[in-house]
């Protein structure tokens, strides 16, 4: 069973200097974070603003606070069918591999582009674009010894366990990993408990050993099927079943990162999350 390490997404704490950000995360009771410079650090509007001095200050802050960089978040659109746009997004990842390595981040991470961002593009075409992006990214990650985690999201290009398995099998890189957000696998039509359990079975048996990080957030559904964010207590997600799967995995440790964290609720959120670890 992995040792689960409770963390939080950095930009839920607002924009700060690296020292103030990691200090706030640690003081809230979290041991690790997902750091996205363009969302969480003051003065960073683009990756051009991520300077060697800033990265060095981040490494120092991590050492001082003991808050690990579990995921180096890049938030890029790897599934753009437009080649010029796709290559520009891929270039952002390539530019950050050295920084992720220097910070000893557990992995880099990205989602795979909402389908709504490119109307008229089929999911098949979006997935083929994703494969092209990963084909460019993974050799550089392998050379640097950096893991790259992609996240399955219900309304994105890579949207099901089946699609995730296809991407992993096609790319076949030992450095390609999965960020597992239980809530992001679920839509209104598969929110019933037995349907969720079938998904967890697929995730665990098909690629559970490839999971490099876990995201934890609350979701429920409106009568029209649209989803909305909730507190963890009001969520319809089957955390018990999901963690029953995660507890069977061979990884020595896994970060579990609270997304949409409210710092004032950190203590109750941590208690809620950690009840599923054993």
Indicate residue ranges for each PLM-predicted region.
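Generic structural signal for well-ordered alpha-helices
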Residues: 21-23, 52-59, 93-97, 131-138, ...
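Active-site acidic/histidine proton-transfer and metal-coordination neighborhood
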Residues: 15, 19-20, 57-65, 78-180
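Glycine-rich, proline-tolerant flexible connector loops at the mouths of alpha/beta enzymes
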Residues: 34-58, 112-118
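Hydrophobic faces of well-ordered beta-strands that scaffold small-molecule active sites
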Residues: 2-9, 33-35, 69-74, 108-110, ...
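Acidic/histidine-rich catalytic cores of soluble enzymes
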Residues: 6-7, 33, 132-236
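A short, acidic, flexible beta-alpha connecting loop/helix-capping segment that sits on the rim
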Residues: 13, 220, 256-267, 272
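Active-site-proximal loop/turn and secondary-structure-junction residues that shape catalytic pockets
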Residues: 12, 37-39, 76-78, 112-117, ...
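Catalytic domains of carbohydrate-active enzymes, especially glycoside hydrolases
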Residues: 19-39, 103-104
